[in-house]
C-alpha cells in the first residue's frame, strides 16, 4: 500500500515538472516574438498620428491639433472634429 502511494506521488511530481517545463517553453516563445510584434504595431500607429503641438490653445490650423481634433477659429483652441477612428 505504501509503495503504491509513493509511486503515485512520484508520477504526479514528474508530470508536474514536465507540464511546468512545457508551459515555460511556450511562454518563452511568446516573449521572444512579442517585442518584434510590438515594434511593428508602434510604427503603424506612429505613422497614422500627427503631433499634438497646440492641444490646449494657440492653434491656427487643424494640423496643429491632435488626430480627430480641429482648430476652432474663434477662440483658437483644439476641439473634437466629429470624426471617429
Curated annotation (Swiss-Prot):
GO CC annotation: extracellular region
An example molecular function term from Gene Ontology annotations: ion channel inhibitor activity
Expression by tissue: Expressed by the venom gland.
Positions of the propeptide segment: 22-51
UniProt entry keywords in alphabetical sequence: Disulfide bond, Ion channel impairing toxin, Knottin, Secreted, Signal, Toxin
Signal peptide from the UniProt entry: 1-21
Disulfide-linked positions: 52-66, 59-71, 65-78
Cellular localisation: Secreted
Domain writeup: The presence of a 'disulfide through disulfide knot' structurally defines this protein as a knottin.
Protein family (similarity comment): Belongs to the neurotoxin 10 (Hwtx-1) family. 28 (Jztx-11) subfamily.
Free-text function comment from the UniProt entry: Probable ion channel inhibitor.
Protein name: Kappa-theraphotoxin-Cg1d
Upper lineage: Eukaryota, Metazoa, Ecdysozoa, Arthropoda, Chelicerata
Amino acid at each position: 500500500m505504501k509503495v503504491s502511494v509513493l509511486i503515485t506521488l512520484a508520477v504526479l511530481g514528474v508530470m508536474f515538472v514536465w507540464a511546468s517545463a512545457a508551459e515555460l517553453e511556450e511562454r518563452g516563445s511568446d516573449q521572444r516574438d512579442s517585442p518584434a510584434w510590438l515594434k511593428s504595431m508602434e510604427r503603424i500607429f506612429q505613422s497614422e498620428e500627427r503631433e499634438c503641438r497646440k492641444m490646449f490653445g494657440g492653434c491656427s490650423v487643424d494640423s496643429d491639433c491632435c488626430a480627430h481634433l480641429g482648430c476652432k477659429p474663434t477662440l483658437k483652441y483644439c476641439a473634437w472634429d466629429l470624426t471617429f477612428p
